[in-house]
Regions:
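Beta-rich carbohydrate-recognition modules and glycan-binding surfaces
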Residues: 204
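Metal-dependent nuclease catalytic cores that hydrolyze phosphodiester bonds in DNA/RNA
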Residues: 1-115, 130, 138
Length: 204
């Protein structure tokens, strides 16, 4: 038996996510600010960033994380294939409001005919953090609220795949939550997003 390690062409993670979905690829063909970038900058400004101690994360590492998220999204679509086929679940692509663009992961029509924003995340952190979303998931909640405002709904869901579960022992798991917003909550969060973008000079 001869075992030889090899690198495919194109290599991983590019083979998984493709050049258009790499973290370094532009999301939009113009200069409009992207919701995710605004929220990430807001988080850094208020000390809620998701950076790590020590050396900054590399582009290659970011792309591996992106590959993990891409895999979860595609497996999730397969698990909900009936809704995908009948057209009640879809990926909307780019949406825009007040000069800001965003790309919700999925939109779904609920039983009452209402629109639901569906956000999919892959995390290596402990699944216990899901017990307190407002503490540990400020960026994700802000992102979901932004998408909800952009598409005109108060209904949303967050589905998180935890690669190592709660780490005791490290067994994969998934957790999900329905998040119902008030119009006031969405207005306040959106106002903060737009205001931050203007202060940074990203919006006129």
């Amino acid at each position: 038996m001869v075992i030889t390690e090899f690198t495919p062409t194109p290599p991983y993670p590019e083979r998984i996510v493709g050049p258009d979905t790499f973290t370094g690829a532009p999301r939009s063909r113009d200069s409009r600010p992207h919701l995710t970038d605004i929220i990430r900058d807001m988080a850094e400004a208020i000390g809620r960033g998701k950076g790590r101690s020590g050396d900054p994360i590399t582009e290659e590492e970011l792309n591996w994380y992106a590959a993990g998220g891409w895999l979860w999204e595609h497996v999730w679509d397969m698990a909900h294939r009936e809704a995908v086929v009948d057209g009640t679940l879809w990926s909307p692509g780019e949406v825009e409001l007040d000069g800001i663009v965003g790309t919700p992961d999925r939109l779904r029509v609920n039983e009452d005919g209402g629109l639901v924003v569906v956000e999919l995340k892959t995390r290596w952190a402990s699944a216990r953090k899901f017990d307190d979303l407002e503490k540990w998931y400020w960026q994700e909640l802000s992102q979901i609220a932004g998408y909800a405002k952009m598409v005109g709904t108060v209904h949303s869901e967050l589905h998180v795949f935890y690669v190592a579960g709660n780490w005791q022992p490290p067994i994969p798991t998934a957790r999900c939550a329905r998040i119902e917003w008030t119009e006031r909550e969405l207005e306040e969060r959106w106002g903060g997003i737009v205001g931050h973008a203007r202060r940074k000079g990203w919006l006129k």
